[in-house]
């Protein structure tokens, strides 16, 4: 795999359109962060909607929304949220599985541990928690803001509770993926 940093793109419609047109056949995959919402000022999502085949444009994970995955001929585009933890979650669970399909899913690296916390969550989302593992119990980081990278750098891994569950009870077994 060869990786190229294409720099920071100004949030300008003309520059975004030129950038994507210039690079659309140069790379197998282009991954960007920021500009993936569908507001009038999100020029990346606008360009991808108009010029590529949208494979999906939302995921039901937190942190992680919104995400665009699209295709044009043999080129693929991932437009990830601007939030750093949402970018990490999507890179770990979506992009890496796309790049390395032999992994199929994360079940081979998933373990179950007891939750050291209780929390209500939206039942229509899979939620990821940055956690510390201590004596076989998972604890969330004190810093819960999704833009706070310290919680990721100090975490042992991600615990996740799938869609369909609206709460986590202390002592309940939950899934954990160690970094």
Region locations from a protein language model:
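Flexible glycine/proline-rich
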Residues: 50-179
């Amino acid at each position: 795999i060869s990786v190229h940093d294409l720099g920071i793109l100004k949030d300008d419609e003309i520059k975004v359109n030129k950038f994507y047109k210039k690079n659309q056949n140069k790379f197998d995959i282009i991954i960007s962060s920021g500009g993936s919402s569908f507001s009038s000022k999100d020029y990346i999502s606008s360009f991808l909607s108009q010029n590529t085949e949208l494979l999906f444009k939302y995921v039901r994970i937190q942190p992680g929304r919104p995400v665009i995955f699209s295709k044009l001929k043999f080129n693929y585009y991932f437009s990830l949220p601007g939030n750093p933890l949402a970018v990490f979650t999507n890179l770990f669970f979506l992009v890496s599985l796309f790049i390395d399909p032999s992994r199929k899913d994360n079940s081979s690296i998933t373990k179950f541990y007891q939750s050291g916390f209780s929390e209500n969550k939206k039942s229509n989302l899979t939620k990821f928690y940055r956690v510390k593992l201590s004596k076989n119990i998972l604890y969330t980081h004190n810093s819960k803001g999704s833009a706070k990278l310290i919680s990721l750098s100090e975490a042992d891994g991600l615990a996740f509770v799938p869609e369909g569950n609206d709460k986590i009870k202390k002592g309940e077994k939950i899934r954990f993926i160690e970094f």
